[in-house]
């Protein structure tokens, strides 16, 4: 009898979630991001995004600026925005629609899928993550209430940056982002959302943004290779 059989016999796992129980001699710890993240589920064509919305900061703005084909998905990208602005219903500027309140735009559209990417513009300094994560949790609650249970909410990990960019913005250093993303994964699971690990597509072996897909500033993505890699991953 293999160790796996003994394990299965002695430990009974409950329903899927971010935490696990203690049973017998085994302590089942909380899942980490590598387990929580959504695995590949087969390729879909771009029409999959026709009933989707994308909510985020300047990285999401790039979908509009570079006219990335997402089959008419609603792009709610706002430069410099963080989850606090969404929760507090701040007036934010869309490059295509002007001033608006993101929650109102999403409430009117009622997308079936929502892809969130926030953090790159708000985690540039060390010590900002606690406030960021607290607001992120509140934001997910607000979005669920606004969009209902039928909307699939995808929480995307904060992408890595190039080493030179991390030196200027220590809050975006690889080890810092790994820690924040780990907490984002746990938060997503606890709120019934799907966690997507963009590092699978965007990070090199050292945990930095791949040079070939980086914009000159080392933080944003290049129009062709960068956004192509992102969309292909999604």
State each model region's role:
Residues 129-139, 177-178:
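Charged helix-capping and loop-helix junction motifs
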Residues 117, 156-157:
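Alpha/beta-hydrolase-fold catalytic nucleophile elbow
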Residues 147-152:
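A short helix->loop->beta-strand "cap" motif at the edges of active sites that frequently abuts
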Residues 42-134:
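Conserved SGNH/GDSL esterase-like catalytic core that processes O-acyl groups on lipids
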Residues 8-46:
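Non-catalytic propeptide/linker segments at domain boundaries
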Residues 140-144:
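Surface-exposed amphipathic alpha-helices with a cationic face
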Residues 2-7:
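Short, small-residue-biased leader/transition segments that mark boundaries at the very start
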């Amino acid at each position: 009898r293999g160790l796996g059989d003994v394990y299965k016999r002695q430990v009974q796992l409950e329903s899927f979630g971010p935490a696990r129980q203690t049973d017998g001699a085994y302590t089942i710890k909380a899942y980490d991001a590598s387990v929580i993240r959504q695995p590949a589920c087969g390729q879909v064509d771009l029409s999959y995004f026709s009933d989707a919305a994308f909510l985020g900061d300047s990285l999401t703005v790039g979908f509009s600026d570079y006219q990335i084909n997402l089959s008419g998905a609603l792009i709610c990208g706002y430069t410099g925005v963080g989850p606090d602005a969404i929760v507090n219903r701040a007036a934010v500027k869309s490059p295509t629609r002007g001033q608006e309140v993101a929650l109102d735009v999403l409430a009117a559209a009622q997308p079936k899928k929502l892809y969130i990417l926030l953090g790159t513009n708000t985690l540039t300094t060390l010590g900002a993550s606690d406030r960021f994560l607290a607001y992120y949790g509140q934001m997910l609650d607000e979005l669920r209430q606004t969009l209902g249970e039928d909307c699939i909410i995808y929480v995307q990990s904060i992408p890595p940056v190039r080493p030179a960019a991390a030196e200027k913005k220590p809050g975006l250093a690889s080890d810092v982002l790994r820690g924040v993303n780990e907490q984002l994964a746990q938060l997503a699971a606890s709120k019934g959302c799907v966690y997507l690990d963009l590092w699978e597509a965007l990070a090199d072996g050292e945990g930095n943004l791949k040079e070939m897909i980086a914009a000159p500033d080392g933080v944003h993505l290049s129009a062709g290779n960068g956004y192509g890699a992102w969309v292909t991953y999604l």
